[in-house]
Every structure is written in structure tokens, then in C-alpha cells.
């Protein structure tokens, strides 16, 4: 089933829409799935760990606290995410290796690109509610993203009268 975030907003006017801060870096611009969240600052240890675990079509939401000094996602972690079935990654921070990210079948949204990697200090919190871009991102809630924007909903959104979901 095809969908767009404008169609979802028209059908579900109560969805929460993120401020338009993010750029697409991945090879897939439309993606959706239940969220797994990470809160970290200039340390992608948890992002790396999660990318190596089964994604099962989920979306990894990373609150990097808006830091533009270090990239929280690069080609190796993104390739792990693809291999393990993640639908996409939304990062309130930076990515790197953007030419390679663009070739991967993964949704990747971030604030910007930065060539500097993080230092891994084994820091970060997983499955905690985070808030950025004017949106509360809650583990298990659903994220929908495409070229028009990002929205979140507490459950999968049905597009037909029969209760089917995306």
C-alpha cells in the first residue's frame, strides 16, 4: 500500500508533525515503523549496538541533542541496520559517509553531515521518551517519514475502512 504524510495528515488530523529540520540522506525517502529511541550526546555506542540487533521494520530515533560536532551514524552502522531489517533512522544530530548512505535501502534523516566520528564511551539511554523538533518520540509509537515530513502516532495508522495499517 502506498501512502504519503500529507494523506496521513488529511485522514488523521490529530497526528503530531515534527518541525521541518531534517534532511534525507538514505536511499529510501519513505519509511515507517514502531520507534526504538536512544538519547546520547556525541557518543554512538548505543546506536551501534542497536543496529546490530534485529530491527524487524522498526525505526531508530536518536536524540543526539542537536550536536553538529560529531556524526552519530556512518556507512558501517547504516549497513548493519540494513542487514538487520531496520526501516529507518531519524537523528537529531549528524551523519557522515553521505555518498554511501544514499545508496543504502534505508531511510536516514538527520540535521546535517559532519565528517568527524564520535568517541565511544559506552554512554546513552535506550527506550526512553525523547523530545525534539517539537515532538515527543515515545518507544513503541509509530513514525512515518517521507519527502514531505515526519509525523508520529501512538499506533499504526489505518488507510482503509477495513482497519488495515501501513
UniProtKB/Swiss-Prot annotation:
Cofactor entry: a divalent metal cation
Alphabetized UniProt keyword annotations: Lyase, Metal-binding
GO molecular function list: 4-hydroxy-4-methyl-2-oxoglutarate aldolase activity; metal ion binding; oxaloacetate decarboxylase activity; ribonuclease inhibitor activity
EC number: 4.1.3.17, 4.1.1.112
Residues the record lists as binding substrate: 74-77, 96
Catalytic reactions of this protein: 4-hydroxy-4-methyl-2-oxoglutarate = 2 pyruvate; oxaloacetate + H(+) = pyruvate + CO2
Top EC class of this enzyme: lyase
One Pfam family this sequence matches: RraA-like
Cofactor: how and how many bound: Divalent metal cation.
Record-listed a divalent metal cation binding positions: 97
GO biological process: regulation of RNA metabolic process
Subunit structure: Homotrimer.
Function: Catalyzes the aldol cleavage of 4-hydroxy-4-methyl-2-oxoglutarate (HMG) into 2 molecules of pyruvate. Also contains a secondary oxaloacetate (OAA) decarboxylase activity due to the common pyruvate enolate transition state formed following C-C bond cleavage in the retro-aldol and decarboxylation reactions.
PANTHER family in UniProt: 4-HYDROXY-4-METHYL-2-OXOGLUTARATE ALDOLASE 3-RELATED (PTHR33254), REGULATOR OF RIBONUCLEASE ACTIVITY A (PTHR33254:SF29)
Protein family: Belongs to the class II aldolase/RraA-like family.
Protein's name according to its UniProt entry: Putative 4-hydroxy-4-methyl-2-oxoglutarate aldolase
Protein species of origin: Xanthomonas euvesicatoria pv. vesicatoria (strain 85-10) (Xanthomonas campestris pv. vesicatoria)
Amino acid at each position: 500500500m502506498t501512502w504519503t504524510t500529507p494523506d496521513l495528515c488529511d485522514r488523521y488530523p490529530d497526528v503530531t508533525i515534527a518541525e521541518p529540520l531534517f534532511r534525507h540522506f538514505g536511499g529510501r525517502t519513505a519509511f515507517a515503523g514502531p520507534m526504538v529511541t536512544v538519547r546520547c550526546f556525541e557518543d554512538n555506542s548505543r546506536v551501534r549496538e542497536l543496529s546490530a540487533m534485529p530491527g524487524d521494520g522498526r525505526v531508530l530515533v536518536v536524540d543526539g541533542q542537536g550536536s553538529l560536532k560529531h556524526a552519530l551514524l556512518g556507512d558501517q552502522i547504516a549497513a548493519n541496520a540494513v542487514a538487520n531489517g531496520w526501516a529507518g533512522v531519524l537523528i537529531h544530530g549528524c551523519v557522515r559517509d553521505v555518498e554511501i548512505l544514499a545508496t543504502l535501502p534505508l531511510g536516514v534523516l538527520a540535521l546535517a553531515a559532519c565528517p568527524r566520528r564520535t568517541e565511544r564511551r559506552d554512554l546513552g539511554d535506550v527506550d526512553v521518551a525523547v523530545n525534539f523538533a517539537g515532538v515527543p518520540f515515545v518507544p513503541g509509537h509509530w513514525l512515518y517519514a517521507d519527502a514531505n515530513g515526519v509525523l508520529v502516532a501512538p499506533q499504526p495508522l489505518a488507510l482503509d475502512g477495513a482497519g488495515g495499517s501501513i
